[in-house]
């Protein structure tokens, strides 16, 4: 029945794409490059939904390659005994090098580049062409009404277009659990790209159709996409990673976000795509990572933990794990998953209500919620918003200030990469404490320096240094760890529901900051950063008291720890 429904859905979606293509051909005003892009996108989703023959052949070749590595005795034993082979000793530190191989790296790239790139790119892409799009909206409204458009009206429309991205993120985040359970982590990521297609159609055709409402709809749809990606991608990355690489692989999600924000800043320059004619193309480039993911992710297996713990497919989970590890010596990991599977079978599927009622689940849920609040209420968005103004205060001209802002973005990328290395050495809790403690001191000093920046060159230059330092501190832990920490705190049965709550909270906090920062900044000036400093001090105390260290711990060990705490 399920396969029949999937075939009907695939057929209907392909027919919908063909009708959209015919519509684009009939509308003369639509630029040719958008029609060409539509052809490519429709083929892309036909590729994803119909699963061409050569893709199946490639998958079979991967499976056969794994099977050929087995000896005849192993194959005979596997055929007669579905249970695992005798566990081998746990790998030593020297043996752990096999954990990262070409196939695992390929799966990480397919999942992260196609998902978190959407998140970061669409966060930053609207900044550079803001004035161009506002002018277009103003002219459009004047043509509609025959009256000069008030700047306040244009500002309101633009604010809605920007902030509705967060509203979409809240909705997408709340859907993570149901999508992850229904379609799987990999399947959910692939289907999520349909929203990217719709976004490109709306945003790419908005100027030709003379409708700023299409920009708002597109931003809303890509917000839902980003919200789903923020839950599904870290979940998939966490579940396919060896235990000793789980933190490093989880950090990749934030690393790609910082990279994509930097890419959006560069492409938005006036010398590249930041022009009246090219800004629709700038918005439409979000389709590129979607195409990459739709082509590459089908070659990767579904999460082994999802296959075994959620679907009970032992052999498929073992094949997927062998593919990801590049070796058939996966019996130890399979034993750990089977142990978790036996414990999961003893309890019913975790509901949203159960998360708040069960003490052993409520404690990690509160931790997950607080670290998500901490990330967004740390003041990073406010500092990034203020960065260009701070550089201008230091008497840098407009071009130099823009270049300095991009340098901050580049530093964010570099330091997030550094955190990818540190997270498995220093641990999650240590990096969170170091990051938020340093940010507390930095933010308090930044508020003081900004208050005197207009009259003191020394204060203005000190502000630049403090902004750079703030970004470094944020990138070393608070920026990346919350995304994957949620997946580490919960077992398989509770993870989808808990991730839905945590991601929805993250986007809600993001929305609160985006809406509330400007009014507070107008009322308090530079002293608005004192609020962020106070919040950071609270988060340091909370992390020190409540957040456990999850480095190198299995899911069963973490769950057992929370059960013991709940009984105390």
Briefly describe each language-model feature range.
Residues 2-6, 13, 21, 27, ...:
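Alpha-helical transmembrane bundle of multi-pass membrane proteins
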Residues 32-33:
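Short linear segments in intrinsically disordered or otherwise low-structure-confidence regions
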């Amino acid at each position: 029945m399920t396969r029949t429904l999937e075939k009907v859905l695939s057929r209907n979606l392909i027919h919908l794409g063909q009708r959209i293509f015919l519509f684009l051909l009939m509308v003369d005003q639509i630029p040719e490059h958008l029609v060409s892009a539509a052809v490519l996108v429709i083929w892309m989703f036909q590729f994803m939904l119909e699963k061409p023959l050569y893709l199946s052949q490639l998958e079979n070749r991967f499976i056969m390659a794994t099977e050929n590595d087995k000896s005849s005795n192993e194959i005979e034993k596997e055929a007669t005994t579905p249970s695992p082979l005798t566990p081998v000793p746990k790998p030593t530190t020297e043996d752990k090098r096999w954990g990262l191989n070409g196939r695992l790296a390929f799966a990480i790239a397919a999942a992260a580049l196609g998902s978190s790139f959407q998140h970061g790119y669409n966060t930053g892409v609207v900044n550079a062409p803001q004035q161009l799009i506002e002018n277009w909206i103003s002219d459009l409204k004047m043509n509609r009404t025959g009256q000069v458009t008030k700047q306040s009206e244009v500002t309101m429309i633009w604010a809605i277009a920007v902030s509705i991205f967060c509203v979409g993120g809240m909705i997408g985040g709340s859907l993570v659990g149901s999508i992850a359970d229904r379609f799987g982590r990999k399947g959910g990521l692939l289907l999520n790209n349909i929203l990217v297609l719709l976004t490109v159609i709306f945003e790419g055709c908005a100027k030709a159709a003379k409708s700023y409402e299409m920009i708002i709809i597109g931003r809303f749809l890509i917000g839902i996409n980003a919200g789903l990606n923020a839950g599904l991608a870290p979940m998939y990355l966490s579940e396919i990673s060896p235990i000793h690489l789980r933190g490093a692989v989880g950090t990749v999600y934030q690393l790609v976000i910082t990279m994509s924000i930097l890419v959006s800043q560069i492409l938005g320059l006036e010398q590249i795509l930041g022009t009246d004619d090219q800004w629709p193309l700038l918005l439409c480039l979000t389709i590129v990572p979607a195409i990459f993911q739709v082509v590459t992710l089908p070659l990767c297996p579904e999460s082994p933990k999802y296959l075994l713990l959620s679907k009970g497919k032992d052999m498929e989970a073992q094949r997927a794990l062998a593919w990801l590890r590049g070796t058939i010596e996966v019996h130890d990991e399979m034993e750990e998953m089977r142990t978790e599977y036996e414990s999961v079978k003893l309890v019913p599927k975790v509901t949203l209500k159960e998360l708040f009622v069960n003490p052993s689940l409520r404690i990690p849920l509160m931790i997950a919620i607080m670290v998500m609040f901490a990330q967004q209420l740390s003041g990073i968005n406010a500092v990034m918003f203020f960065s260009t103004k701070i550089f201008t205060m230091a008497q840098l001209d407009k071009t130099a200030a823009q270049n300095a802002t991009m340098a901050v973005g580049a530093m964010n990328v570099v330091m997030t990469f550094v955190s990818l290395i540190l997270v498995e050495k220093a641990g999650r809790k240590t990096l969170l404490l170091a990051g938020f403690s340093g940010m507390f001191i930095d933010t308090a000093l930044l508020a003081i320096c900004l208050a005197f920046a207009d009259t003191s060159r020394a204060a203005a230059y000190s502000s630049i240094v403090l902004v750079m330092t703030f970004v470094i501190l944020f990138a070393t832990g608070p920026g990346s760890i919350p995304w994957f920490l949620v997946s580490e705190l919960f077992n398989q049965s509770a993870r989808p529901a808990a991730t839905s709550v945590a991601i929805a909270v993250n986007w809600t906090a993001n929305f609160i900051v985006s809406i509330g920062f400007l009014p507070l900044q107008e009322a308090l000036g530079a002293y608005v950063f004192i609020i962020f400093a106070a919040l950071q001090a609270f988060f340091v105390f909370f992390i020190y008291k409540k957040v456990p260290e999850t480095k190198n711990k299995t899911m069963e060990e973490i769950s057992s720890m929370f059960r013991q705490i709940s009984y105390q």
